[in-house]
């Protein structure tokens, strides 16, 4: 995994691009209303952080930010961000869904805003790529 990340970094730099690593989004893994279990991606997050530091590449820690958002929202309220809906709600997806991985529109917007926040915090060329205010 780390070698693969380093290949992406090297190729990006060879093409005059500015690499940035973004840790994976946390899955919904609540043990109760406010407490998350150990995330499914924690080993990948640690490896990515190590690779970013070793290669002097900025990192947006979406994993940590999304865990904080999930804890703040709680088990029940965070369902609105993921593919949780009752049977018959959607014509093209008539069956019930309790998907703790894939996002609905509101979840995608919410977590993308965390990535934008992270890029702004890095600053420089990364922040310059962002619009000041986007109305969705």
Question: Which residues does each predicted region cover?
Answer:
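Alpha-helical cap/lid subdomain in secreted, periplasmic
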Residues: 1-109, 113-131
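A short, charged, Gly/Pro-tolerant segment at domain boundaries
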Residues: 132-136
